[in-house]
Amino acid sequence: MQFDVLTLFPDFFTSPLQSGLLGKALEKAIASVNLINPRDFTTDKHRRVDDEPYGGGVGMVIKPEPIFAAVESLPVLSKREVILMTPQGQPMDQALFRELTNYDQLVLICGHYEGVDERVCQLVTREVSLGDFVLTCGEIPALTLINGVIRLLPGTVGKEASLIAESFSTDLLDYPHYTRPPVFRGLAVPPVLLSGNHQAIAQWRLEQQEERTQQRRPDLWQKWQDRQPSP
C-alpha cells in the first residue's frame, strides 16, 4: 500500500515512521509513505501556501493551487482514496481502518491554520476526523490513520490472531491482561488464567470484555447487543 501525505511539516513524521512496528513494516515494504510538501508546488518566490479568508475572519486559509498541483503530480493507482484530515470528517474507528486496507493508495491532505480552501474538496473522496475536537494541524490524525491501517496489513503484526481479539474488532473492549509474577504487591492474577482450562479462560475473557464495555462504553455495548441473534 502507498501513502502519499501532503504536509507542510514533513519532519513531523520522521521519528514515528522509523520506530516500532511501523518502521519495520516500511522496511519490509509492506507499505510506503511518500511525504509531499505543498510549498514545493507554489509559484511565488516566498513559497506562500496560505492567504486571508474571503469575507473576513480570524486566521489564514490554505490556498487551493499548491494542493491541486501536488495531488495532480502523483501517480494514480487502481484503487485510490484522497482523504482530507478535517474536524468535519467521518470519525476514525477500527471499521474505517479495516475498510481502507482494501485500497492500493491513500492520499492524505493535512489541513492547517483555519483549514483548506473549500475548492480542495473537489479532489477529495473522503473526509476523516480524529474526533470531536480541534488540533493545531492535520498531521496528528494523518499519522494515526497511517498507523491504524498499516498494523492491519498482513506481515506487520507478528501474531495476526491478536488483531482479531483486540478492542473494537468485535465492538467489545479488550479483556484484562496479566503476566508474571503471579502475585504483585498483594494483587493476584485471576486463578482461571493459571488453570490451563482454555474453555474456562475464553469464557472468563468474554465476560470481562462484556463487563468492561457495558461499564465504560455503553455506546459500543449497545452496538454489540444489537448484533446478537434474537433468543
From Swiss-Prot:
InterPro entries named in the record: Alpha/beta_knot_MTases, tRNA_m1G_MeTrfase_C_sf, tRNA_m1G_MeTrfase_TrmD, tRNA_m1G_MTases_N, tRNA_MeTrfase_TRMD/TRM10
This protein's UniProt keywords: Cytoplasm, Methyltransferase, S-adenosyl-L-methionine, Transferase, tRNA processing
Hydrolase as UniProt keyword: no
HAMAP family, per database record: TrmD
GO CC list: cytosol
Protein purpose: Specifically methylates guanosine-37 in various tRNAs.
UniProt-listed SUPFAM superfamilies: alpha/beta knot
Entry similarity comment: Belongs to the RNA methyltransferase TrmD family.
Entry protein name: tRNA (guanine-N(1)-)-methyltransferase
Organism taxonomic ancestry: Bacteria, Bacillati, Cyanobacteriota, Cyanophyceae, Synechococcales
Quaternary structure, from the entry: Homodimer.
Region (Disordered): 210-231
Catalyzed reactions: guanosine(37) in tRNA + S-adenosyl-L-methionine = N(1)-methylguanosine(37) in tRNA + S-adenosyl-L-homocysteine + H(+)
EC number: 2.1.1.228
List of residues binding S-adenosyl-L-methionine: 111, 130-135
